[in-house]
Amino acid sequence: PMHWFRQEWILQPDKHNALHLHFMMTDNPSLSEETRQRYERTYSGVFYQRYVLGKWVAAEGVIYSMFSETENTYRPDQRPKAMAWLSTRTIAVDYGTTNPTRFLDIYDDGETVRVDREYDWDSRKEHAQKTDREYADDLLAFMGPQPCTVIVDPSAASFIAELGRRGVYVVKADNDVPDGIRKTAGLIGRRIIQICETCSRLIDEMGTYVWDEKASQRGEEKPVKQNDHSADALRYYVNSLPDWRFE
């Protein structure tokens, strides 16, 4: 609502000798019913209100409000038996020095994205800060004997270099926050993202990851930088997916 175009043009049409007409996606005759339904499946929450309903709404409150502990989680005994063989495995990392470091063990079979395990080290709570070498040791132990791709926040240059020396295949994450949140929200809303109940920190963050209301009042859109470490790691993975996964 605080976007300059809305403030200057939408709310003051007479000032510019302009006419404001509100259109929804259903008013676009060039879009087929199939295309409209695809977009309606793609967007959730505030993004649905904006891109489908055409509303100027603020991003506020819980970001992943569409997350359901009933529909977006699974118990360990519900894990598909052939998951490891029928899925591509990736470890997504949000690296911190004073902030927590999180690893997410992700299995993707092309239809469902399963976050099966998580690693957490909070140097403040543990009163002990780990080195890049120690984190690399932990990641290799977390990975186990079967190697896989590791996606890491690009700002963690020294950690990426340490993993490279260990022979780990590292991909620098796409750290686009707004687009990553939009994509992640869509996959959560369509129940494509499934989280094992043992990943308690990631599940907790689904309810505590919130928009920054003060930034919204300035016309900016960004999340509060706290309780976001597992959510960031998940976003890094989602940003690595091809566009067709969001259709």
Q: Which residue ranges define each predicted feature?
A:
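Conserved beta-strand scaffold positions in the cores of enzyme catalytic domains, especially
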Residues: A18-H22, T90, V170
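A residue-level signal for conserved active-site and pocket-lining positions in enzyme catalytic cores
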Residues: F23, V52, D94, F103, ...
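ATPase catalytic-site recognition across NTP-hydrolyzing enzymes
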Residues: N28-V93
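Mg2+-dependent endonuclease catalytic cores in nucleic-acid-processing enzymes, primarily RNase H-like
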Residues: L104, G110-K225, P242-R245
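Stable alpha-helical structural segments in soluble proteins, enriched in small hydrophobic residues
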Residues: H229-S240
